[in-house]
């Protein structure tokens, strides 16, 4: 009767899909799986070294692109400065002429000022918000002291151009200083033997090794260890300490980059000369500084626009020609200033890319030094404890395979594989080892 009840219980359990998997491999088979997994780990160790060198190549490529950008910036700077010189020359010539059409321009200016003030303060209250009262008084004083002739010859645009030129020079100097210091450190780092020699045979693997008459650290198992320290001294090696100068230099290079990337000197100027009147918060600073930002809103006031359209050629044709010459050179200077700013942004992007690569390099170096320390012994890198296939269960998906492994000095790591990764798949242990390495590295980063 008891036997019958037991059979019924087993059948019910089976029907409910609650039978857990059983160990399916012998000790010899587990050993073979361990050997296969360790081969994969050994290959990944060598890939880690190559990963460091790959990042080095990317940094060098970025550095070469930076140098090319600097050449382009130098050419663009010459063109921009030439256009600025032409603009200043035309401005000085125009200022030398007696002011004409004064009555017409002054009448329009008196109607332009209240509209300009109202438009600017409305913008400031909506976008900038703070300090409207003080800004309003400053603006009224600024407008009363300004001349419609300054307005007529686009003096505000010329002043904006000159200020942008000053800021752009400051930005370029800051980035140049940062990149020069970081590049010097990086060049010194990459001259080290680690980067200038090819690694040894990456396919070597000997899980059990040979009996040693001398201490095992004189016969390092990993080719990584042998390529990093081919003539090892007596005593355990600490690869983290060996790499410490590398870590220090990478940190110094990162600091050289990051300090400038977050420096106030790296605030790019607003060069959207053609987008006057838009809700640009950067105009707030200019308005608070000297009220000239309000002149960017002249396009919203009809009488202000009429000042720009005043034709004084009948009174003084030469002055009209000079004004046209000024406007032409001004447009060229604005276009070249915008192009120059785009190149500066590209250079900043290269700096950010290099900073990110330095962070990756530091992370990869940390991983390589950790692997080098872990692979000095004679034991297999990866040992498989159990391989179990589960049928359907309330907590475990149907037909998954669980592989419990010990990797290096870790606690047991459980790798769960879906049904499509069969135990008969030649890449079965590669997948197990890959997932185990990922988990091991994740836990190492958290410690």
From Swiss-Prot:
Disulfide bonds join 101-312, 112-304, 115-301, 120-294, 128-284. Pfam families: Clusterin. Glycans are attached at residues 102, 144, 290, 327, 353, 373. SMART domains: CLa, CLb. Detected in Sertoli cells (at protein level). Detected in cultured Sertoli cells, testis, epididymis, liver and brain. GO terms for cellular component: aggresome; apical dendrite; cell periphery; cell surface; chromaffin granule; cytoplasm; cytoskeleton; cytosol. The modification Phosphoserine is found at residues 132, 394. It is a peripheral membrane protein. PROSITE patterns: CLUSTERIN_1, CLUSTERIN_2. Proteolytically cleaved on its way through the secretory system, probably within the Golgi lumen. Proteolytic cleavage is not necessary for its chaperone activity. All non-secreted forms are not proteolytically cleaved. Chaperone activity of uncleaved forms is dependent on a non-reducing environment. One of its GO terms (molecular function) is amyloid-beta binding. The keyword Cytoplasm applies. Residues 1-21 form the signal peptide. GO terms for biological process: amyloid-beta clearance; cell morphogenesis; cellular response to growth factor stimulus; central nervous system myelin maintenance; chaperone-mediated protein complex assembly; chaperone-mediated protein folding; endocrine pancreas development; estrous cycle. InterPro entries: Clusterin (IPR016016), Clusterin-like (IPR000753), Clusterin_C (IPR016015), Clusterin_CS (IPR033986), Clusterin_N (IPR016014). A motif (Nuclear localization signal) lies at residues 77-80, 441-445. The keyword Disulfide bond applies. It is found in: Secreted; Nucleus; Cytoplasm; Mitochondrion membrane. Its main location: secreted. Functions as extracellular chaperone that prevents aggregation of non native proteins. Prevents stress-induced aggregation of blood plasma proteins. Inhibits formation of amyloid fibrils by APP, APOC2, B2M, CALCA, CSN3, SNCA and aggregation-prone LYZ variants (in vitro). Does not require ATP. Maintains partially unfolded proteins in a state appropriate for subsequent refolding by other chaperones, such as HSPA8/HSC70. Does not refold proteins by itself. Antiparallel disulfide-linked heterodimer of an alpha chain and a beta chain. Self-associates and forms higher oligomers. Interacts with a broad range of misfolded proteins, including APP, APOC2 and LYZ. Slightly acidic pH promotes interaction with misfolded proteins. Forms high-molecular weight oligomers upon interaction with misfolded proteins. Interacts with APOA1, LRP2, CLUAP1 and PON1. Interacts with the complement membrane attack complex. Interacts (via alpha chain) with XRCC6. Belongs to the clusterin family. PANTHER family: CLUSTERIN. This is Clusterin.
């Amino acid at each position: 009767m008891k036997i019958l009840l037991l059979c019924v219980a087993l059948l019910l359990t089976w029907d409910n899909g609650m039978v857990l998997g059983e160990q399916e491999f012998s000790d010899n088979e587990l050993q073979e799986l361990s050997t296969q997994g360790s081969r994969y780990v050994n290959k990944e160790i060598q890939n880690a070294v190559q990963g460091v060198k790959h990042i080095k190549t990317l940094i060098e490529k970025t550095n070469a692109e930076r140098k090319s950008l600097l050449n382009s910036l130098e050419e663009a700077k010459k063109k921009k400065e030439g256009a600025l010189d032409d603009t200043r020359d035309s401005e000085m010539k125009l200022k030398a002429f007696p002011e004409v059409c004064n009555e017409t321009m002054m009448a329009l200016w008196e109607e332009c000022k209240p509209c300009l003030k109202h438009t600017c303060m409305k913008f400031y209250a909506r976008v900038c918000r703070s300090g409207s009262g003080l800004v309003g008084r400053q603006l009224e004083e600024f407008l009363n002291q300004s001349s419609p002739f300054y307005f007529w010859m686009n003096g505000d645009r010329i002043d904006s151009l000159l200020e942008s030129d000053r800021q752009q020079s400051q930005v370029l100097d800051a980035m140049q200083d940062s990149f020069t210091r970081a590049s010097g450190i990086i060049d010194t780092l990459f001259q080290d033997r680690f980067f200038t020699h090819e690694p040894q045979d990456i396919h070597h693997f000997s899980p059990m090794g040979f009996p040693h008459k001398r201490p095992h650290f004189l016969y390092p198992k990993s080719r990584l260890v042998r390529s990093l320290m081919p003539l090892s001294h007596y005593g355990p090696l600490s690869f983290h300490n060996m790499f410490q100068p590398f870590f220090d230099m990478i940190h110094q290079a990162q600091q050289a980059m990051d300090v400038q990337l977050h420096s106030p000197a790296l605030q790019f100027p607003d060069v959207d000369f053609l987008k006057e009147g838009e809700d640009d918060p950067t105009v707030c600073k200019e308005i608070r500084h000297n009220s000239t930002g309000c002149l960017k809103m002249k396009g919203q006031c009809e009488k202000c626009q009429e000042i720009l359209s005043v034709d004084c050629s009948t009174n003084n044709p030469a002055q009209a020609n000079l004004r046209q010459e000024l406007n032409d050179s001004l447009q060229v200077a604005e276009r070249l200033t915008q192009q120059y700013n785009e190149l500066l942004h590209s250079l900043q992007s290269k700096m950010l890319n290099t900073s990110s690569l330095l962070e990756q390099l530091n992370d990869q170096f940390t991983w390589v030094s950790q692997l080098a320390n872990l692979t000095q012994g004679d034991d297999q890198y990866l040992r498989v404890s159990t391989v179990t296939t589960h049928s359907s269960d309330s907590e475990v998906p149907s037909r998954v395979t669980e592989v419990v492994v010990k990797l290096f000095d870790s606690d047991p790591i459980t790798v769960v594989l879906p049904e499509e990764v069969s135990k008969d798949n030649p890449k079965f242990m590669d997948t197990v080892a890959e997932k185990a390495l990922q988990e091991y590295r994740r836990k190492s980063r958290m410690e």
